[in-house]
């Protein structure tokens, strides 16, 4: 029985002025990829790099946040019913009403959209 090789965690490439950028393959997370956004978050406890992915599961849109903070990787997921949304410069998770989340997503600059909602 062959055991599949585990994918490596995506690497972070540091740019000038300590602004972290990353190149993550959306298929690393979900096949039904819709959009992604990268943001950098700072507060008095430190900084975090956050990648938010939107994928489609049937008629639902799924948000997935991948966070690199204090040398640790974490992630969380939510459907539109939970309305977790990430915005640069704010708390990593911002709860919005479902209609607001959809409207905010449509209007927010910086998303790389591959299909219309």
UniProtKB/Swiss-Prot annotation:
Alphabetic keyword roster: Cytoplasm, Nucleus
GO cellular component, one term: nucleus
Location of the protein in the cell: Cytoplasm; Nucleus
Keyword Cytoplasm: yes
Remaining remarks: Present with 952 molecules/cell in log phase SD medium.
Listed name of the protein: Uncharacterized protein YJR146W
